[in-house]
C-alpha cells in the first residue's frame, strides 16, 4: 500500500472537530486503541513482526497510542509541546525499521476503528475528513523525520549476520557474537555506546517473524557485535537463543539504533544503576568512562550470585582502575556475599530507593532495569531534581 502524504492545512472547523474529540479520547482512548491493534494485526500480516505479544497482552502498546492520540488532539494547533515525544517515536521506528508504506495501514485501521466504535452522529463525514487530514499530517511529519535518520544509517532494513561465538556469562545469560555475511559492511560500523540492535527471528513452527531488540553489550572488537541475553522462562526468543542457537547460524540484524547513549562531555561523577540484564547497555559506557579517567559508581542488583553476569569483568575494572571504579551489589534471593564475589560492597537484599540518597544533581545517572524498578528510581530521584537517563525496551511509558 503506497500513499504519498502531503501536509494539508486544517480549517478552523476541522481543528474544532479534533479538539472536540479530546473528551472522547480521555474516556475511551484505550478501548479505541485496543480495537485498532486487533484490527491491524488481524488483517495486515506485514505489520505483525513489529509488535510484541507481551506488550499487547499487558496493553502497553494500546496505552501509549492512546496517550499519543490524546496529546496530538490536544496540541493540534501547535505540536511544539510534543517535540520530545515525537523524537522518541522516531527513534523507536528507526530501530524497528518502520517504512513509509506502513503508515497507510495505520491510517486506514485508525479511521475504520473510529467508524466502528463511535456513533454515526459523531463519526460523520466531516469528522472522518478532519481526522484523515490530521493523521496524514502526522504521518508526513514522522516519515520525513525518519527519512533523515535512515540516511545516516550504515545499511537499510535487516542484513544477514553469522554467529561466530556463544559464551555462557552466568547461569542464565549467554553472550552471542556475530559478524556480517556481506563483507562490504566491514569494517563493522560502530554504534554509539548504549545503543541496541533489532533482530527479526523466524522460529520453527511460527508463521511470522518476531522482532526483538537487544543492547550491544560490548563496544565492537574484531568486527563482531555482541549481545547478551537472559533466558526468560517461557520466552520464545530467549529460549531459542539459549537452547537452539549455534555457531554458524544466520541472524537478521538492523543497524544500531537508540538515543540512550553515553555523553562523554560531562565532568560529573557517573552513577550507573542496573537491574539484572539491564546491565548490558551500560557495559560499554562504564568501560569508556573509566578509560577517560572519570569516577564511576555502579549499583548492580541481581537475584543471586549465580545469575549475576559480568562479575569477572568488573573485578578486572577494579584491578585496573582502582578507586575510580566502585561496584556496590545487591542480591535479593542469595546469602552469598563472600570475598570471592564482592568487589567493593554487597548486600543480601533488594536495592531500594534509600540506597540512592547519596545521589545529587551533581551526578550523571544512567538507569536500566525492569520497568517498575526504573519507574520507582526515576520518581525518587526526580523529587531531588536529579535528571536520569534511562532506556525502555518496547513501548515507552507515557
UniProtKB/Swiss-Prot annotation:
Cofactor: FAD; heme b
Residue ranges of the region described as Reductase: 155-398
Residues annotated to bind heme b: 93
Gene Ontology BP annotations: cellular response to nitrosative stress; filamentous growth; filamentous growth of a population of unicellular organisms; nitric oxide catabolic process; response to toxic substance
GO cellular component: cytoplasm
Class in the EC hierarchy, top level: oxidoreductase
Domain FAD-binding FR-type as annotated: residue spans: 156-263
Pfam families listed in its UniProt record: FAD_binding_6 (PF00970), Globin (PF00042), NAD_binding_1 (PF00175)
Catalytically driven reaction(s): 2 nitric oxide + NADPH + 2 O2 = 2 nitrate + NADP(+) + H(+); 2 nitric oxide + NADH + 2 O2 = 2 nitrate + NAD(+) + H(+)
Protein name: Flavohemoprotein
Organism field: Candida albicans (strain SC5314 / ATCC MYA-2876)
GN (gene name): YHB1
Amino acid at each position: 500500500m503506497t500513499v504519498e502524504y502531503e501536509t494539508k492545512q486544517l480549517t478552523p472547523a476541522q481543528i474544532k472537530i479534533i479538539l472536540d474529540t479530546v473528551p472522547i479520547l480521555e474516556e475511551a482512548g484505550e478501548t479505541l486503541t485496543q480495537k485498532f491493534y486487533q484490527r491491524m494485526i488481524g488483517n495486515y500480516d506485514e505489520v505483525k513482526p513489529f509488535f510484541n505479544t507481551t506488550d499487547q497482552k499487558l496493553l502497553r502498546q494500546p496505552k501509549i497510542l492512546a496517550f499519543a492520540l490524546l496529546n496530538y488532539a490536544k496540541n493540534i494547533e501547535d505540536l511544539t509541546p510534543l517535540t520530545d515525544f515525537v523524537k522518541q517515536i522516531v527513534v523507536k521506528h528507526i530501530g524497528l525499521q518502520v517504512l513509509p508504506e506502513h503508515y497507510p495501514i495505520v491510517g486506514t485501521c485508525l479511521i475504520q476503528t473510529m467508524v466502528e466504535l463511535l456513533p454515526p452522529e459523531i463519526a460523520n463525514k466531516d469528522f472522518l475528513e478532519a481526522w484523515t487530514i490530521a493523521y496524514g499530517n502526522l504521518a508526513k511529519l514522522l516519515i520525513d523525520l525518519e527519512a533523515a535518520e535512515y540516511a545516516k544509517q550504515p545499511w537499510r532494513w535487516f542484513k544477514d549476520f553469522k554467529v561466530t561465538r556463544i559464551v555462557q556469562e552466568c547461569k542464565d545469560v549467554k553472550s552471542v557474537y556475530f559478524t556480517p555475511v556481506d563483507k562490504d559492511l566491514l569494517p563493522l560500523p560502530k554504534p554509539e555506546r548504549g545503543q541496541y540492535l533489532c533482530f527479526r527471528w523466524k522460529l520453527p513452527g511460527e508463521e511470522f517473524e518476531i522482532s526483538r531488540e537487544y543492547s550491544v553489550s560490548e563496544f565492537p572488537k574484531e568486527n563482531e557485535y555482541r549481545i547478551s541475553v537472559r533466558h526468560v522462562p517461557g520466552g520464545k526468543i530467549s529460549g531459542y537463543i539459549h537452547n537452539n542457537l549455534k555457531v554458524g547460524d544466520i541472524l537478521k540484524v538492523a543497524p544500531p539504533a537508540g538515543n540512550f547513549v553515553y555523553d562523554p562531555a560531562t565532568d560529573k561523577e557517573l552513577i550507573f544503576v542496573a537491574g539484572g540484564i539491564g546491565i548490558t547497555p551500560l557495559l560499554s559506557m562504564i568501560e569508556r568512562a573509566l578509560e577517560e579517567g572519570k569516577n564511576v559508581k555502579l549499583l548492580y542488583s541481581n537475584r543471586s550470585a549465580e545469575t549475576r553476569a559480568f562479575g569477572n569483568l568488573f573485578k578486572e575494572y577494579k584491578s585496573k582502575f582502582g578507586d575510580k571504579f566502585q561496584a556496590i551489589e545487591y542480591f535479593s534471593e542469595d546469602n552469598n556475599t563472600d570475598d570471592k564475589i564482592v568487589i567493593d560492597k554487597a548486600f543480601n537484599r533488594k536495592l531500594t530507593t534509600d540506597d540512592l540518597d547519596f545521589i545529587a544533581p551533581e551526578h550523571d545517572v544512567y538507569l536500566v532495569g525492569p520497568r517498575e524498578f526504573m519507574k520507582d528510581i526515576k520518581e525518587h530521584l526526580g523529587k531531588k531534581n536529579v535528571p536520569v537517563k534511562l532506556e525502555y525496551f518496547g513501548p515507552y511509558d507515557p
